[in-house]
Amino acid sequence: MSSKIIKENKRLVLDLYKRCLYSAKRCPKYQNQMMMESYIKLKFRSNKEIHQKDFETIENLLKQGEEELKSMNDFHELRAKSKSGQDHESILNDCFDDDFNYIGSTPTVKK
């Protein structure tokens, strides 16, 4: 049973890593791409020594990584909306509730 969990966790970590690197490549400036790529590699390397059976820590780190990835992708969506000419007020309405709490960018950008 635990070997299946270990294998699945490895798959999830690798998938998250690839999606993070892909998101970094979406940064408009090469310098920002390289900075984000370095940050991603550093974060993953710093957690490489976590024991593969420390399921709770791995789960928490995966959640953290997914949240950071969502933030990066939200930034890309906002940038795309801004470039497409969408007004700033509607962009902000997509990202914040009435109390100005961040809720993320939910609508998809049409290309």
UniProtKB/Swiss-Prot annotation:
Chief place where the protein resides: mitochondrion
Keyword Mitochondrion: yes
Source species taxonomy: Eukaryota, Amoebozoa, Evosea, Eumycetozoa, Dictyostelia
The protein's assembly and partners: Interacts with the iron-sulfur protein subunit within the SDH catalytic dimer.
Origin species: Dictyostelium discoideum (Social amoeba)
Swiss-Prot/TrEMBL keywords: Chaperone, Mitochondrion
Gene from which this protein is expressed: sdhaf1B
InterPro entries membership: Complex1_LYR_dom (IPR008011), Complex1_LYR_SDHAF1_LYRM8 (IPR045295)
Any GO BP annotation: mitochondrial respiratory chain complex II assembly
GO cellular component: mitochondrial matrix; mitochondrion
Record carries keyword Oxidoreductase: no
Cell compartment(s), UniProt: Mitochondrion matrix
Pfam families: Complex1_LYR
The name this protein goes by in its record: Succinate dehydrogenase assembly factor 1B, mitochondrial
Biological role stated in the UniProt entry: Plays an essential role in the assembly of succinate dehydrogenase (SDH), an enzyme complex (also referred to as respiratory complex II) that is a component of both the tricarboxylic acid (TCA) cycle and the mitochondrial electron transport chain, and which couples the oxidation of succinate to fumarate with the reduction of ubiquinone (coenzyme Q) to ubiquinol. Promotes maturation of the iron-sulfur protein subunit of the SDH catalytic dimer, protecting it from the deleterious effects of oxidants. May act together with SDHAF3.
Source superkingdom: Eukaryota
Family: Belongs to the complex I LYR family. SDHAF1 subfamily.
Residues in the signal sequence: none
